[in-house]
Amino acid sequence: MKIISEGETKLMVPEESTLSKKDTVFYNPVMETNRDISVSVVQSFLDDFKRDEFLMCDPLGGSGARGIRYAKELKFNGDLKVSIGDINPSAVKMIKENLKLNELENVEVFHEDANVLLSKNFKVFNVVDLDPFGSPVPYLDSGIRASLTKGGLLCMTATDTAVLCGAYRKTCIRKYNAVPLKGDKELAVRLMIGYAVKMASKYDIGLKPIFSHVTDHYARTFMVTERGAGKADSAIENLGYIRQDSEQKSFKTFEEGSEKGYAGPFYLGEISDKNIVQNALNTAKTRNYSKRAVNILEMISRESEINQVGCFDIHELCSFIKKLVPPVNDIMENLKENGFKVTRVHYNPYGLKTDAELSDLVVLISEYHSKKY
């Protein structure tokens, strides 16, 4: 074992990890960025929380890194309590050692299956964070029911992004009851949100995303639970289908239904709230969290200003129109000069989010080549 630091927290973790299910206790150092962002986003949510008690649950605790960082680093004037669970007795032992290391008394540890722990706590938690190895689907129903407090927060990670991005089409249809679409990683998190919205609606619960990102091997989202059939109906109205021809996306609403050539359903509404993102960014900067976490938050802050589903991949677009790829910064400058909003996206170095149409981009790239060459 070794002791490392993440944020303001000390953690005892395995000396070596294969980052697979073979590990006795799972700890992934690559996910420090994920945890930095998670603490920042939940802190932003917590800043507007009006009750005296704030109850959180990390039912898939592993080494306890996520839940313990929440317990140690979240600032709250009231009573903040965290429940951490794991089915693995070795993990439970390590979580308890990490609690001693950080001198925390506001955490309760459970040696229990995640679904059992969540089911025993129906409508109890203000925040449930599902961070599994693979898909969150097996835990989603229990997670929704455990976070049905008024204005609760459901956070979830999916590491099966190859499935969500369309590499395993049949698996996606089977697991997420949706047809995936290849090419744009943002659609992975939108598909995951869409599935969660459908699951929650049967309980007359609407889910409203306040922060989402796709980084490395995972997709992650944070969704506020809003009670009432009307809220569930409003959330469903944000679902729809997408057809992509070359770089052009076409959309159909959920009620219109899908037809041949369309994928989905995807969540087509806003997936990140501007104020939440900005407050999370301020938190990450103030606490000197990892530079990478700050960079991702900065990029998503700019993305949240532009209402576009996905992005335009400049390399793919230029390949389609048979043009050499101009410098991305030059394309951005030309778009701005023509009155369009534009920003790079956090998940694709060649991706641009803009309010320009595909035809506008084609014209600008063609004009760039005619002037340059």
Curated annotation (Swiss-Prot):
Any idea what this protein is called?
Answer: tRNA (guanine(26)-N(2))-dimethyltransferase
SUPFAM superfamilies membership? S-adenosyl-L-methionine-dependent methyltransferases
- The gene from which this protein is expressed is trm1
Which keywords, in A-to-Z order, does the entry hold? Methyltransferase, RNA-binding, S-adenosyl-L-methionine, Transferase, tRNA processing, tRNA-binding
- Do you know which NCBIfam families this protein is assigned to? TRM1
What residue stretches are annotated with the Trm1 methyltransferase domain? Answer: 2-365
EC number from the UniProt entry: 2.1.1.216
The record's annotation in InterPro entries points to:
SAM-dependent_MTases_sf (IPR029063), Trm1 (IPR002905), TRM1_arc_bac (IPR022923), tRNA_met_Trm1_C (IPR042296)
